[in-house]
Curated annotation (Swiss-Prot):
GO cellular component: cytosol
The protein's assembly and partners: Homodimer.
NCBIfam families linked to this entry: PRK09194.1, proS_fam_II
Alphabetic keyword roster: Aminoacyl-tRNA synthetase, ATP-binding, Cytoplasm, Ligase, Nucleotide-binding, Protein biosynthesis
Function per UniProt: Catalyzes the attachment of proline to tRNA(Pro) in a two-step reaction: proline is first activated by ATP to form Pro-AMP and then transferred to the acceptor end of tRNA(Pro). As ProRS can inadvertently accommodate and process non-cognate amino acids such as alanine and cysteine, to avoid such errors it has two additional distinct editing activities against alanine. One activity is designated as 'pretransfer' editing and involves the tRNA(Pro)-independent hydrolysis of activated Ala-AMP.
Name of the protein described by the UniProt record: Proline--tRNA ligase
GO biological process: prolyl-tRNA aminoacylation
UniProt source species: Francisella tularensis subsp. novicida (strain U112)
Any one GO MF annotation of this record: ATP binding
Record field: catalytic activity: tRNA(Pro) + L-proline + ATP = L-prolyl-tRNA(Pro) + AMP + diphosphate
Location of the protein in the cell: Cytoplasm
């Protein structure tokens, strides 16, 4: 492609809301242009990257035995009402009605239409398994769209849905899709981790997120430095301490005056306590109005997902109000503890492991020291209720856990019969009986992975794309293209030769100043830069620059061809 035949719309102006590097660079490089809040035009260079990602996704999905189809983007309300999601989706669902006053919505996801199609066309186990996918624009009316295409209202997604007769068949396809997502991200060239994830309201036994590693990631993921264990922070666990090895303390409980101390940090600072010897006692109320005291070590944080999954607690829970706490303890938050606690205690394993712990005295401005489990507190339950921290022992006993930020670009999970059952998507099984099909669902954020790639690899000058998705592999940057016949001749011939070799190449024939060409090339992120000028041509050389390594070489065109091919 010649630069004069496409639209290179680089700019130095940035809106204030462009906080993330990916958002800034996509705007500055002219890859996208904002049309409305959370809605963007894909400019020629941006669309080219997007299409390369789509091609990789499509190629790997086809290799995995999935078949592509295209579902409508506008969905009738009746379908979502069958699964009760017409109301459950809330304001994120963009609703509209036609001239006949029939209700529709812009598809945020496509479980209902795919099941509707399947129930009309799949009647027997002999037609299964079947894996269908599409690459399509979705719309979710985010209350606060931000971070560019990372969290836009309109986005492009690959969503696949598989259909099965039994759980083993579903698990087989699930494992195939797990491997396929790894292949996609490997082929793109991103550093990532598949992590065990919470299934949430969807349910099922299996769920994995595919997280691209990046400092700007909203998700926190943990992984072992000694094994392949990895999980989202919501689900991550740790090796439990051996509580049988606790020694009996001979120290007696002591009540100490701690005026105006309401936080663990202040307690440790003013009283010189080790924070790992302290506990935090937080009061929650479950959905049936039952109160519980949740106890964790002073330097740990509660994990909401784990708490909502406890058998003792009817989800969802809420934090008790200050008034509710005072009515139970006759003390305020910041002074609560486990000794003579009037409500059920659920303590984390790490809190249980503490000997001679420090806790609130259930009396304002007082704390206890040298409190011990089983000796002083006997009525309690133990559970994993905290977030893991760096240095925890991996649950498989191999290595310790480390935390990093990630950007979720893919999510796969087993739907089972969550949608097929209420929508009566039944088949005749091998036993001759009618039963709901089991389903798997596999989402991949095509437009989001583009932003994730930028977050993972960039410098102060612009984007450093993985070569597989760079808008152009090679940019020919001729100096004085419109003034020097020799430069033009060499540049044009090289351009044609590279095209003939199947290389994706851009010839910058705009006649722009060298500084502008070089800055644009760095900003946009072409993988290989070839500078052609009269000075070097006199020596039979051109200048080659690798965008990723920044290495520059003065080489012959023959040597250049060897590098590029």
């Amino acid at each position: 492609m010649k630069a004069t035949q496409t639209l290179i719309a680089t700019t130095k102006e940035l809106p204030k809301e462009a906080v993330l590097i990916s958002h800034q660079y996509m705007l500055k490089a002219g890859l996208i242009k904002k049309l409305a809040s959370g809605i963007y035009t894909w400019m020629p260079l941006g669309l080219k990257v997007l299409q390369k990602i789509q091609n990789i996704v499509r190629d790997e999905m086809n290799k995995a035995g999935a078949s592509e189809l295209l579902l409508p983007s506008i969905l009738p309300s009746e379908l979502l009402q069958e699964t009760h999601r017409w109301d459950k989706f809330g304001p994120e669902l963009l609703k509209l009605h036609d001239r006949h006053n029939r209700d529709f919505c812009y598809g945020p996801t496509h479980e209902e239409p795919i099941v509707d199609m399947a129930r009309d066309t799949i009647k027997s186990y002999k037609q299964l398994p079947l894996n269908l996918y599409q690459i399509q624009t979705k719309f979710r009316d985010e209350i606060r769209p931000r971070f560019g295409v990372m969290r836009a209202r309109e986005f492009i997604m690959k969503d696949a849905y598989s259909f099965h007769e039994n759980s083993q068949c579903l698990r087989n396809t699930y494992n195939t899709m797990y491997a396929t997502y790894c292949n996609i991200l490997d082929k793109i060239g991103l550093a990532y981790r598949p992590v065990k994830a919470d299934t949430g309201a969807i349910g099922g036994d299996n769920s994995h997120e595919f997280q691209v590693l990046a400092n700007a990631g909203e998700d926190i993921i943990c992984y072992s430095n000694g094994s392949d264990y990895a999980a989202n922070i919501e689900l991550a666990t740790y090796a439990k301490p051996d509580l049988s090895k606790r020694v009996n303390s001979q120290n007696t409980i002591e009540k100490i005056h701690t005026p105006n101390i309401k936080t663990i940090e202040k307690l440790c600072k003013e009283m010189s306590f080790d924070i790992k010897k302290t506990i935090k006692t937080m009061v929650i109320k479950d959905a049936e109005g039952n109160f519980f005291a949740l106890v964790i070590r002073g330097d740990h944080e509660l994990n909401e997902t784990k708490i909502n999954k406890l058998e003792q607690i009817v989800a969802p829970y809420t934090l008790a109000t200050k008034e509710e706490i005072f009515s139970i303890f006759n003390a305020n938050p910041g002074s609560l503890g486990i000794y003579n606690c009037p409500i059920s205690i659920i303590a984390d394993y790490s809190a249980i492991a503490i000997i001679d712990l420090v806790c609130g005295a259930n009396q304002d401005d007082y704390h206890f020291t040298n409190v011990n489990w089983d000796r002083d507190v006997t009525n309690y339950q133990i559970a994993d209720i905290r977030n893991v921290v760096t240095g925890d022992i991996s649950p498989d006993g191999k290595g310790t856990l480390e935390l990093t930020n990630g950007i979720e670009v893919g999510h796969i999970f087993e739907l089972e019969d969550v949608y097929s059952k209420p929508m009566n998507a039944n088949i005749i099984g091998q036993d001759g009986k009618s039963k709901p099909m089991l389903m798997g669902c596999y989402g991949f954020g095509v437009s989001r992975v583009m932003a994730a790639a930028i977050e993972q690899s960039h410098d102060e000058n612009g984007i450093i794309w993985p070569e597989s998705i760079a808008p152009y592999q090679v940019a020919i940057l001729p100096i004085n293209y419109n003034k020097s016949d020799k430069v033009k001749e060499v540049a044009d011939k090289l351009y044609q030769d590279l095209l003939g070799d199947g290389i994706d190449v851009l010839l910058d024939d705009r006649g722009a100043r060298p500084g502008v060409m070089f800055a644009d090339a760095d900003l946009i992120g072409y993988s290989h830069h070839v500078v052609i000028g009269d000075r070097l041509l006199e020596q039979g050389l051109i200048e080659y620059k690798n965008r990723k390594t920044q290495e520059k070489q003065e080489i012959t065109i023959t040597e250049l061809i060897k590098i590029l091919t």
